[in-house]
Amino acid sequence: MSVDNNQRDLEAGIHTDLQGRLTYGGYLRLDQLLSAQQPLSSPPHHDEMLFIIQHQTSELWLKLLGHELRAAIGFLQRDEVWQCRKVLARSKQVLRQLTEQWSVLETLTPSEYMGFRDVLGPSSGFQSLQYRYIEFLLGNKNAQMLQVFEHDPAGQAQLRTVLEAPSLYEEFLKYLARFGHAVPAVYEAHDWTQPHVADDALQPVFERIYQDTDRYWREYALCEDLVDLETAFQLWRFRHMRTVMRVIGFKRGTGGSSGVGFLAKALELTFFPELFQVRTSLQAAPPAEQA
């Protein structure tokens, strides 16, 4: 099909009288959203707009990720496995989007960044409340992080709430216990503010599931969803570190951290350690007995 005059005419049914009615821009509050990019460099450095939008869009995706992970926890609490799997699948795609987004910031050269870096002062992505919130939801609890938000009592209170509640993984362990798996009783109630660390007592639970996936398919599928989620998150962390290395090398971060070295340490953190350890300890299932 060709358009002779290279113009697409409005169809008769398209709404054009929008006075006083809900519009696309009104629904999305684009007047507020698109006026939030305010470069501080003077005169405005061309590439500061990229830097601002990169981080603002990341925060929007993080908001959605937190929304989905809270839903996943709720579904687990109600034993709604398929609904939980759906939002975990969406969460993985959000993380993929966040990871690929670094390729845009990678177009920022070191000299371009140095042209406006000074105006950032001590501000840093390290201070992202939503990032810490998601880490806590996934089990990387660290009460020290609350200190970073002393300037924001409301945000600090929000972070404290998730610090003191069971993480996604802890809710998964409680789900397994409800369905007859030998999860130690300590996971029913303990100090939720502590990060989860690898527990040898959980290994038999996951070996049982992985050795008989037909029998425990729901549990196995959820395990693999969590493995996908952690892998996606770690890829995002890795891409972040490499982007920072590419743009600033080994300079200190604006927030006072060692920069790349500090980001690299995050790659050593894990959310669901037993789900990776079981791959080492797993043995072939014994052959079925012949009748």
Swiss-Prot record:
GO terms for biological process: L-tryptophan catabolic process to acetyl-CoA; L-tryptophan catabolic process to kynurenine. Pathway: Amino-acid degradation; L-tryptophan degradation via kynurenine pathway; L-kynurenine from L-tryptophan: step 1/2. Keywords: Dioxygenase, Heme, Iron, Metal-binding, Oxidoreductase, Tryptophan catabolism. Heme binds at residue 240. It catalyses: L-tryptophan + O2 = N-formyl-L-kynurenine. Belongs to the tryptophan 2,3-dioxygenase family. Homotetramer. This is Tryptophan 2,3-dioxygenase. It comes from Stenotrophomonas maltophilia (strain K279a). The gene is kynA.
